[in-house]
Amino acid sequence: MAGHSQFKNIMHRKGKQDSVRSKMFSKLAREITVAAKAGLPDPTMNARLRLAIQNAKAQSMPKDNIERAVKKASGVDGENYEEVRYEGYGPGGVAVIVEALTDNRNRTASNVRSTFSKAGGALGETGSVSFSFDKVGEITYKASVGDADAVMEAAIEAGAEDVTSDEDGHTIICGFEDMNEVSKALEATLGEAESVKAIWKPQNTVPVDEDKAQSLMKLIETLEDDDDVQNVYSNFEVSEEVMARLSA
């Protein structure tokens, strides 16, 4: 399992999800607004908006918040958010990709650069690390939707490329361009997914020790705490022993 996925599980176990709920809703609302602005404000006619709303619902975002975010896209005085990607290296030479939605590129770039520097890393040029990742679709389901064999069969039928099942749930990987169709096919068989999103999947992972893992987790946590940052991806790998100690 890649380090960032392990980090997400650790944060969940430590109960940090509740403290960042408001921030998470804000990020989900921003994605809904941008998706609605980029196409039609009707989720049945706008695949990106449909998935953004689906992900918001999966996180129990109130219906009023979702509707308000959609309406905000048509507002004359609404903020104009720009999609920006930053790439760099964290401690131990680990590759990191940061996706942001910002109304001020200079502010966001300055904050991201400062965060990398303070963590002992460095921000690079666009393209400096993304060549070692593949952009794919990731569809997740709770473990309760079925056993590994049933989910694997449904995923193959839907046109997915890979499936990972464990006690935390099922993660299905598909081609980025196929994400909308695959998610629809899976929904017909397994029901609505917990999340459907495009991710940067590392082609190879870099093993790190406990000290480096702690530094990287702090870097990721600080980046994700930035209001403009939507997603952070990395290619580090942590052993089960180290993960157990970090989870304690």
Swiss-Prot record:
Any Gene Ontology CC annotation: cytosol
Compartment(s) where it occurs, according to its Swiss-Prot or TrEMBL record: Cytoplasm
GO terms for MF: DNA binding
Main location: cytoplasm
Keywords: Cytoplasm, DNA-binding, Transcription, Transcription regulation
GO biological process: regulation of DNA-templated transcription
Superkingdom of origin: Bacteria
InterPro entries for this protein: Integrase-like_N, TACO1_YebC-like_2nd/3rd_dom, TACO1_YebC_N, Transcrip_reg_TACO1-like, Transcrip_reg_TACO1-like_dom3, YebC-like
HAMAP family membership: Transcrip_reg_TACO1
Assigned protein family: Belongs to the TACO1 family.
Protein name per the record: Probable transcriptional regulatory protein Avi_3631
Organism: Allorhizobium ampelinum (strain ATCC BAA-846 / DSM 112012 / S4) (Agrobacterium vitis (strain S4))
